[in-house]
Amino acid sequence: MTSKKRRQRGSRTHGGGTHKNRRGAGHRGGRGRAGRDKHEQHNYEPIGKHGFKRPPGAERTVAEISVQELDEGAALFVAEETAEFDDGAYHIDARDIADDADSSDITKVLGDGQVRQELHVIADAFSDTARTLIEDAGGSATLTEQGKSIAVGEDEEPNSNDEN
């Protein structure tokens, strides 16, 4: 096989087009990022800020605990004095039990698993499944004051003006 250099012997420009094309950067439209806003074509705007950054004050961290963890650990929680057993039912505050509840803003009970005993649970938020499982077993799911204010805030529509 012959080399490219050998094949192009006798050719004046060696595949570079006309004699003007390989002189300077003019054939390429300038050097580097020259012409980025004028004569260069691009599929995106590479200059400036893009997107949205959520304000840190609007972010909430959520500590999650499942109803199965509450159900299976109810007797242990009573032994550790983080819950109470009264009239055949366990009274549990999920904020005292969730692993990362101290460092989070909200404690939420999720509906993963089964509930076999009567639980009266206090938490900032409940999933619909968790609330149903707890109440079907004869217990109750009670929101904290913080949880009630969060629930009211989610039900309201933002920027609702009824004056028009």
From Swiss-Prot:
Q: Does the keyword Endoplasmic reticulum apply?
A: no
Map out region (Disordered) in residue numbers: 1-59, 137-164
Q: Which UniProt keywords apply?
A: Ribonucleoprotein, Ribosomal protein, RNA-binding, rRNA-binding
* A Pfam family hit: Ribosomal_L27A
Kindly list the GO CC terms recorded for this protein: large ribosomal subunit
A biological process term (GO) from this entry: translation
Report biased composition (Acidic residues) as residue ranges: 153-164
Which InterPro entries does the protein's record reference? Rbsml_uL15_N, Ribosomal_uL15, Ribosomal_uL15/eL18, Ribosomal_uL15/eL18_sf, Ribosomal_uL15_CS
Bias (Basic and acidic residues): 34-43
Q: Does the keyword Ligase apply?
A: no
Q: Which GO terms describe its molecular function?
A: rRNA binding; structural constituent of ribosome
Compositional bias ranges of the Basic residues kind: 1-33
Its quaternary organisation is: Part of the 50S ribosomal subunit.
- What protein family is recorded? Belongs to the universal ribosomal protein uL15 family.
Record's function text:
Binds to the 23S rRNA.
Q: What is this protein called?
A: Large ribosomal subunit protein uL15
| Phylogenetic classification of the source organism | Archaea, Methanobacteriati, Methanobacteriota, Stenosarchaea group, Halobacteria
